[in-house]
Regions:
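Short intrinsically disordered terminal tails
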Residues: 1-2, 58-64
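Acidic, low-complexity, intrinsically disordered interaction modules
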Residues: 5, 9-55
Length: 64
């Protein structure tokens, strides 16, 4: 079973969304701007997503 968490900010002026996916099985974090949204997202401000990514990296997660 996939153990992933999806996070997204609001849509920016270009129509893109800053998003992050945390893969707990492989200890990987993916981030970036995307036009399309992933499923089951938790919405939060971009700054908060960046802080969350840093916390995961401190716990040994890799950023790809």
């Amino acid at each position: 079973m996939e153990n992933k968490m999806y996070f997204a900010s609001n849509v920016d002026k270009n129509g893109n969304t800053y998003q992050a996916v945390v893969d707990n099985d492989n200890k990987i974090v993916r981030k970036g701007y995307f036009l399309f949204r992933w499923k089951d997202q938790i919405k939060m401000p971009k700054a908060q997503i960046k802080q969350m990514i840093e916390k995961y990296k401190q716990q040994g997660y890799k950023e790809v």
